[in-house]
Curated annotation (Swiss-Prot):
Protein origin, superkingdom: Bacteria
Single biological process term from Gene Ontology: cytoplasmic translation
Keyword Iron-sulfur: no
Bilayer-spanning residue ranges: none
Region (Disordered): 218-277
Pfam families: Ribosomal_L2, Ribosomal_L2_C
Name of the protein this chain belongs to: Large ribosomal subunit protein uL2
Subunit (UniProt): Part of the 50S ribosomal subunit. Forms a bridge to the 30S subunit in the 70S ribosome.
Its biological purpose: One of the primary rRNA binding proteins. Required for association of the 30S and 50S subunits to form the 70S ribosome, for tRNA binding and peptide bond formation. It has been suggested to have peptidyltransferase activity; this is somewhat controversial. Makes several contacts with the 16S rRNA in the 70S ribosome.
Length: 277
């Protein structure tokens, strides 16, 4: 989990840092768990841009990840820790006792040769997956389901973890990485530990080309666009934006404007919003 710096023999190397990938044990993924991944370039099924600044980048295959962890009671041995170009976390190839191979999100401390389990009888050990009702209060967890059996949706990014704070009847109370406190049904599963690659947030990309390799395109300021492209556009030279406050490209207030729906179905599950004291 170390970070490598470079001698500034070129301008782009002066700030650039990279992960050492010392936890990675192989560069050859399991072929049976790969599927082709077509480039979307931020377009939807109609060909319209729904996510700006996306396109290009290196070719990649999608790794099929087991987010459900429903193979209960069968031990699985960790065969390798691998890099996944589709996410910030590392992944672990596990081989079950019956011969089946699956990828899981690798937590911090998981090594080749370790044995992981899932189910109500699994030990409270890094990498094991259990329902929240079987996990002790205070445990650090990741890969959390929002609906039982749907698969993990929360706490999957590199270095992230949630904490099980309490249990009340049919619900568990979790503190998420954002600081949000919310209810989750106790039948939902979670994995023990913190997600791997904890130094990902201090990596400095360092140069534009590296960002392009990751599939990101340049971001252009609205004030240098035409008025039909952005509310800040138009005018002669370096003109003011012409509005009392900054706006998004779609005319909504920018910088701190709340975009969450007032009557979202999950409002009743949130005890404390992120950022609140």
């Amino acid at each position: 989990m170390a970070v490598k710096k470079f001698r500034p023999i070129t301008p782009s190397l002066r700030q650039m840092t990279v992960a050492t990938f010392e936890e990675i044990t192989t560069d050859k993924p399991e072929k049976s768990l790969l599927v082709s991944l077509n480039k979307k370039a931020g377009r939807n099924s109609q060909g319209k841009i729904t996510v700006r600044h996306r396109g290009g980048g290196a070719k990649r295959k999608y790794r099929i990840i087991d987010f459900k962890r429903t193979k209960d009671g069968i031990p699985a041995k960790v065969a390798s820790i691998e890099y996944d170009p589709n996410r910030t976390a590392y992944i672990a190839l596990v081989v079950y006792a019956d011969g089946e191979k699956r990828y899981i999100i690798a937590p911090v401390g998981l090594k080749v040769g370790d044995v992981v389990m899932s189910g109500v009888d699994a030990d409270i050990k890094v990498g094991n997956a259990l329902p929240l009702k079987n996990i002790p209060v205070g445990t650090v967890i990741h890969n959390v389901e929002l609906q039982a059996g749907k698969g993990a949706q929360l706490v999957r990014a590199a270095g992230s973890s949630a904490q099980l704070m309490a249990k009340e009847g049919k619900y568990a109370i979790l503190r998420l990485p954002s600081g949000e406190m919310r209810y989750v049904r106790i039948e939902c599963r979670a994995a023990i530990g913190t997600v791997s690659n904890v130094t990902n947030d201090i990596i400095n990309i360092g140069k534009a080309g590296r960002k392009r390799h990751l599939g990101f395109r340049p971001t252009v300021r609205g004030s240098v666009m035409n008025p039909n492209d952005h509310p800040h556009g138009g005018g002669e030279g370096k003109s003011p934006i012409g509005h009392p406050s900054p706006l998004t490209p779609w005319g909504k207030p920018a910088l701190g404007y709340k975009t969450r729906k007032n009557k979202k179905y999950s409002d009743g599950m949130i005890i404390k919003r992120r950022g609140q004291k």
